[in-house]
Amino acid sequence: MKIEKSQRNLEIDRSRKNDFLYPLIFREYIYTFAHDRDLNRSILLENVGYDNKYSLLIVKRLITRMYQQNHLIISANDSNQNTFFRYNKNLYFQMISEGFAVIVEIPFSLRLVSSLESSEIVKSHNLRSIHSIFPFLEGKFPHLNYLSEGLIPYPIHLEKLVQILRYWVKDPSSLHLLRLFLHEYWNLNSLIIPKKSISFFVKKNQRFFLFLYNSHVYEYESVFFFLCKQSFHFRLTFYQVFLERIYFYGKIEHFVEVFTKDWGDSLCLLKDPFIHYIRYQGKSIFVSKDTPLLMKKWKYYLVNLCQCHFDVCFQPQKIHINPFSLYKHSFALLGYLSSSSVRLNLSVVRSQMLENAFLMDNIMNKLDTTVSIIPLIGSLAKMKFCNAVGHPISKPTWADFSDSDIIDRFVRICRNLSHYYSGSSRKKSLYRIKYILRLSCVKTLARKHKSTVRIFLKRLGSELLEEFFTEEEQILFLIFPRASSISQKLYRGRVWYLDIICINELSNHE
């Protein structure tokens, strides 16, 4: 009985009705919606070189060509003889990938909404981003012994990606069209490699291929998550309902509800999982307080699991196991810019576990992210916004653009940096970076009009500088609803953004 129950828990919830998505591919509004969404979303990457080519005429031509082909009988071997692929390959493929990304996300969005409603997750204005805190670094940070990191295995063949989607999208026509385009246009070696992943996402449709990649990784992680859950003696409501683990009172309130039901059994709920798992920037990171022997056993177990069950390439020699003490003062592997960008502070919270019982002081770790000024100045210098010591300079390559375009480019970079570091507690360095960008913008405009900075600022007034502030406020107003009860101070608080994917040298205009 216990084995059957475990097998049911291991099964992924795929009991949904069939999703017939293929007819939506021939709908004109799908491509219009995909294009508009890419223009309006707030991300750190630029939409490179595609806006000028987009038009409804091209969309209609694309749909007409697709209607003329019978994709149900086309295979990857004879796609070279297909007339559909003879003209505008890159443009057609990018448009179809954008449309397919919108269509294939529909069933997943419906599942997400239903899961949120069933779990009654509390809504919070405090959003998270790539720069937020990993949960295990707060409570269990001093007690972890070993850390193992390695690249996430990738499928040997493109067909594996299509087979994974078969579990979720049960529409043969859509999957056949997806298989056709993957075989025709894409090379597996450039699909999932960390060194080129950022440039790939910039040049191609990042949402589409990120969806394929996450689908693959989800299958790989599903077995591991099942094993992690078995380490608890009792089923526990995880703290994922709290978007920020520094909300200590929220955790205490939930703990009291469990604690008052059964004092004896609840003691077992305090048992920690045997291993902590993080997926970050194409890496699998395992942190545990086990012995080195147990960590090695887990290493080879995961290697055999991936090679035998998922048919993926997982090389054991590329998985490194080191004492966690080596990483306690350096968080480079977690994506932070340097060891100085993370600070470990102790917060004391006084709580009362039971009514009329004793009071106790709970000491918890709180990690604060800071803005590292030296790496940011290095990035600005590399992009020719300032020199090596941080003095602003003009950007000659942008002098040929219009004034509004130049200002928009600088404002966009400032907004991206504000989004990325908006959850940091100390932002003085961020204000200095904004000052460098503002002055670089003024120098670029003065260079274009063959004037000095002083004369140009005197003629333009303070309107230019206001652009760098009002743009950020408008973004924040879209997240937090305006109300009389919400003070302006709320907009200046720490905000995590969910839509940040990566930061690629601040901008990608060239």
Curated annotation (Swiss-Prot):
Highest taxon listed in the record's lineage: Eukaryota
Gene Ontology cellular component list: chloroplast
GO MF annotation list: RNA binding
A Gene Ontology biological process term: tRNA processing
Alphabetic keyword roster: Chloroplast, mRNA processing, Plastid, RNA-binding, tRNA processing
Function: Usually encoded in the trnK tRNA gene intron. Probably assists in splicing its own and other chloroplast group II introns.
Name of the protein in question: Maturase K
Gene: matK
